[in-house]
Structure formats: structure tokens, C-alpha cells
Amino acid sequence: MSIKSDKWIRRMAQEHGMIEPFVERQVRGEGANRVISFGVSSYGYDVRCADEFKVFTNINSATVDPKNFDEKSFVDIKSDVCIIPPNSFALARTVEYFRIPRNVLTICLGKSTYARCGIIVNVTPLEPEWEGHVTLEFSNTTTLPAKIYANEGVAQMLFLESDEECEVSYKDRGGKYQGQRGVTLPRT
């Protein structure tokens, strides 16, 4: 497996729709308009967070059960920022829609800007031939409220290309998150 460069990412996005919408350079903004960077980097793509969030709340004193998740455990927010309560988490989605090639596995890592503030981004790998908006999980590990900015960079995708195609892709096995749009809750 080899990690793919900015040239490969640009070509795959422009010719094969791997990332839509696609930003072909790294955007940082200037002066008072600085943003947390997004777009193509040397060996990855920095994704943006959309403006729709689901913030975890325990007002119903529920038990968190991944096999029987209660949608009422979240408060829906549509905003340019999301405040995550101390020691809690929120779900969001990427602005970008991904179409992963059959011979590629994509790994997501959080941006250091958030990590240095105690905000951890978690995403499972994007498997071969998976497509959809990526659901992002933000954990606030601090004892203070934490802010997430919509339409700015939140994580970096790294594309690993195999020297051979897999026998069975995510699409082949009818993965339960195939084609997801919006913030997607757990499915079993």
C-alpha cells in the first residue's frame, strides 16, 4: 500500500468525482478572515464540517446502546458553530461527499488545531467502494465547553492505494452506511 499525493487526489476528484465539492488547494484565509485550513494538502485532503450537528445530551437518563440507540439522546443544531458540553460529544458530517475507489482505503485523522484544545475527531476508515457524506464524531475531553466551526477544516483524509483490488468491497457486501447523506446515527 502506498499513500497518495496531492496530484493523485486532484486527478481522482476532478476526473472521477472522488470528492465533491472539491477544493484543489489548501485554504487558510487571511487576517481577520483566517479559518482552520481545508482542501488538498501534500498527501491528504482536509475536510470541512457542515453546519448540521447532533449534540449528545442525557436529559432522558438513557443508557447508550449501539444496538438500540435512542435518537432522543441528541439535540439537533444548525449553525456556523457548535458548542459541545464538557466531557460530551457531537456528531456532524463532512461538507464533502466521497466515492472511494475499489483499490483504496481512506483513513481519517483529526487536525492538530482541535487536538491541542482537547477536541478529538473520530472516524472509521472509508472502505473500498464506499460512498457518502462522512459522519464525524467530536469528543470534548475537557471540563469546559468546546467550539466546533462549520465550513472549516476538521480532519484530514489519507488515501492508501493497494497493489491489488479486494475480492469484496463495501459496496459488494451492501454496507449499511453506503450512500449516507447527512448526519447518520448508528445502525445494526
From Swiss-Prot:
The active site is at E137. DCTP binds at K111, S112, T113, Y114, A115, R116, T135, L136, E137, Q156, Y170, Q180. It catalyses: dCTP + H2O + H(+) = dUTP + NH4(+). Its EC number is 3.5.4.13. Disulfide bonds: none annotated. Pathway: Pyrimidine metabolism; dUMP biosynthesis; dUMP from dCTP (dUTP route): step 1/2. Coiled coil: none annotated. Keywords: Hydrolase, Nucleotide metabolism, Nucleotide-binding. SUPFAM superfamilies: dUTPase-like. One of its GO terms (molecular function) is nucleotide binding. Transmembrane segments: none annotated. GO terms for biological process: dUMP biosynthetic process; dUTP biosynthetic process; nucleobase-containing small molecule interconversion. It comes from the Bacteria. NCBIfam families: dCTP_deam. Belongs to the dCTP deaminase family. Catalyzes the deamination of dCTP to dUTP. Homotrimer. This is dCTP deaminase.
